[in-house]
Structures are given as structure tokens and as C-alpha cells.
Regions:
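Alpha-helical rod/repeat scaffolding segments in eukaryotic adaptors/tethers
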Residues: 22-29, 52, 83-87
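Intrinsically disordered or highly flexible coil/loop and linker segments, enriched in small
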Residues: 15-19, 52, 75, 110
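Sequence/structural signature of long amphipathic alpha-helices
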Residues: 56, 60-64
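Amphipathic alpha-helical binding modules
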Residues: 63-110
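Generic alpha-helical secondary structure signal
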Residues: 3, 34-37, 41, 53, ...
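Short, solvent-exposed, charged loop/turn and helix-capping segments
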Residues: 41-57
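Generic structural signal for well-ordered, non-membrane alpha-helices
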Residues: 14-15, 34-45, 64, 68, ...
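Short terminal alpha-helical segments
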Residues: 1-40
Length: 110
């Protein structure tokens, strides 16, 4: 079971796998709050039982990529644009999802 959960999380590393948060953000330019929430919840569950370096590296990568997407969105010289951008989504990223992912980087699984 844990291996299936890990593989599901790692699917986000391949931004060509439809139905993942990263596919939505990178390929469709849509920040899907439901997929981000699901990703965070699955990562939290997995890391509560496993101190997995590969998943923690994935979280660091996701944080970096999302930060870059918001930065590119705000750069008028950049072609990347988040189609469904809203201040609410960016606020939730800054105040809910990103802090939670950073917290998960620090926890040790059982």
C-alpha cells in the first residue's frame, strides 16, 4: 500500500501524467486547488509513516516549481500565465499549502 501511495505522489514529477497537480499547472497553466489539497493530504499521510528522502525531495521540487510559476505569472516579460490566477489561490499557496509542505519536510515518519 505504501508503495502505491509513493508512486501516486511521484507521478507529479512527470508533468505529462494527466490528472496530477503538476500536469494541470505546467501543461494546462491551471492551478487546481483540489489537486494541490489532495497532494498535500496524501503526502502528509505517507510521511507520517515513512521518513522518505525521495518524497521530501519531491516536496522541495514542487515548492520551487510553484514559486517559479507564480513569479513567471507576475513577470510581464514571461509568456507563462496561470489561466485561473486569483489572489485567493496565491494567498492559499502562501498561507496554507506551502507552509504545510515545508512542515512535512521537517517531520519524521514512524
Amino acid at each position: 500500500m505504501n508503495e502505491n501511495i509513493k508512486l501516486r505522489l511521484l507521478e507529479n514529477k512527470d508533468d505529462l501524467i494527466e490528472g496530477t497537480f503538476c500536469y494541470s499547472l505546467f501543461e494546462e497553466s491551471i492551478f487546481c486547488p483540489d489537486l494541490m489539497t489532495e497532494f498535500v493530504e496524501i503526502a502528509e499521510f505517507f510521511l507520517s509513516y515513512n521518513n522518505d528522502l525521495e518524497i521530501k525531495q519531491l516536496l522541495e521540487w514542487i515548492i520551487s516549481c510553484v514559486e517559479q510559476c507564480f513569479s513567471s505569472h507576475h513577470d510581464e516579460n514571461d509568456y507563462y500565465h496561470i489561466k485561473n490566477y486569483s489572489i485567493d489561490i496565491e494567498s492559499k499557496w502562501e498561507n496554507i499549502w506551502k507552509p504545510k509542505l515545508n512542515y512535512l519536510l521537517d517531520i519524521k515518519g514512524n
